[in-house]
């Protein structure tokens, strides 16, 4: 079992397969930042599988594949297939912007992917294009339909709520999810890659987001508790699940159960800190053993920070 010094059990590994993305969302890549880790520095698929297997042997049971945009990763379906076969891994999910989903949905299903999260901040074509730096909403909608067709369910839509930008689309997004029978997760805008003034101006606390929802839809608490940080409520009468993620206004650090493996092979212990441990350097060292890798991971997790620093941004 993998524990840190605050007695939190780590069960969830998030793997960033690539830094590359086919969108340019202004809050994710500010100032048109297109600087990526060189391809030569990426973990190979075999290295990713090795590290993931060791995490599974240490007690991790949930793996989420993300990016950048993970569907840009060569052999993505093979990776899904191999990870889903690992002993101890009972949940393999993927977070995508949906642009390529129409193409990949059947292959992902056949590879053993359990479920999908799709990032979607607007269902208005012009606003979607503005937020994403030129993205085509139609492709995402086609990807959602293809995923439903091939049974990649449940599908969760992740909407980052930004005051003055897309907070007027919360209710239309709920209606869209009701129609498609999707789970909606409403996320607070987080200070990642943004100046503090941007965050202060755009941030809408989850409490305020919930109040806006409750003005239009009656809500009741759900007992659902997934591996992630969302607190869920039902829309009464319709059964739609809405998750509220309050990463800034009411952090969930005491129950944090995850770490992130970057495409470079560095283990990132907390999004709100810069601390990293280079696992690629470990596994590429001649003569290193699996036990050496396990000990490195255990020592890294033990040093995981108690809380993030978002509120100081």
Spans of model-derived segments:
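A short acidic, helix-capping loop that chelates divalent metal ions and anchors anionic groups
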Residues: 33-38, 124-131, 193-197, 278-280
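Residue-level recognition of specific faces of alpha-helices
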Residues: 9, 14, 27, 51, ...
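A short, compositionally biased micro-patch
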Residues: 18-20, 111, 236, 262
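Residues that scaffold the ATP/ADP-binding catalytic core of kinase and kinase-like folds
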Residues: 24, 28, 73, 126, ...
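Auxiliary Fe-S-binding modules of radical SAM enzymes
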Residues: 1-12, 175, 179, 189-313
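Radical SAM/AdoMet-radical enzyme domain recognition
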Residues: 42-65, 72-187
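Canonical Radical SAM [4Fe-4S] cluster-binding loop centered on the CxxxCxxC motif
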Residues: 6-44, 271
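Glycine-centered loop/turn positions within well-structured domains
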Residues: 23, 125-126, 251, 277
